[in-house]
C-alpha cells in the first residue's frame, strides 16, 4: 500500500525513554527535542553552514545561532520597569498633545502618586477612554456616617449600619 520512500512522508524514530523516568520528566525531554522542520533547516547537507541568503527573516538568523535554551529565554523577555515606565510616559505624552492642560495634569498626577510596588497596568486601568485619570473618590461609593440625620439625595446605598448591642438598628 504505502511506499517507504515517499517524499511526502517524514519518517523518524524516537528512542524509548529510560523506564526509571517519571512521565513529567519524559514530557520535558520530549518538549526540548527539536521539531522535524528545525532539523531540516539546521542540518542542511548542501553546506556546513546555514546559507543566510535563504533565510529572509534577520531575527531568525540570529536565533538559529543560539542554543535552544537561549532561544526559549529570548522569546519570553518582558520589559523592565524602566522600559515600562518609558512606554507609559510616551503613551501619556501622545495623549496629552491633543488635550487641555488640566486633563494632562490629572493623568501625570496619577502616575506620580503610584506606589513602586503597583505595576503600570493598574495605572492604565484607572485611565478613562479619553486618557484622563478618574478620581478614586468617584469610583468608590460613599457611605453615610452613622450619626447623620440628613436625608440622602443620592441613590440608595447597599450599606447596612451595624446593630447596637441590643440587636436593634440605631440610626
Curated annotation (Swiss-Prot):
Modified sites of kind Phosphothreonine: 35
Modified residues (Phosphoserine): 43, 46-47, 67
Biased composition (Basic and acidic residues): 19-29, 135-157
Region (Disordered): 1-171
Ranges annotated as spanning the membrane: none
Post-translational modification: Phosphorylation of Thr-35 is required for activity.
Keywords: Acetylation, Carbohydrate metabolism, Glycogen metabolism, Phosphoprotein, Protein phosphatase inhibitor
Region (Interaction with PPP1R15A) location: 143-171
InterPro entries the UniProt entry points to: PPP1R1A/B/C
Entry's Gene Ontology molecular function annotations: protein phosphatase inhibitor activity
GO terms of biological process kind: glycogen metabolic process; intracellular signal transduction
Source taxon at top rank: Eukaryota
UniProt modified residues of type N-acetylmethionine: 1
An example Gene Ontology CC term for this record: cytoplasm
Region (Essential for activity): 9-12, 42-54
Keyword field contains Transcription regulation: no
PANTHER family, sorted: PROTEIN PHOSPHATASE 1 REGULATORY SUBUNIT 1A, PROTEIN PHOSPHATASE INHIBITOR AND DOPAMINE- AND CAMP-REGULATED NEURONAL PHOSPHOPROTEIN
Family: Belongs to the protein phosphatase inhibitor 1 family.
Physiological role: Inhibitor of protein-phosphatase 1. This protein may be important in hormonal control of glycogen metabolism. Does not inhibit type-2 phosphatases.
Complex and partners: Interacts with PPP1R15A.
Protein name: Protein phosphatase 1 regulatory subunit 1A
Gene: PPP1R1A
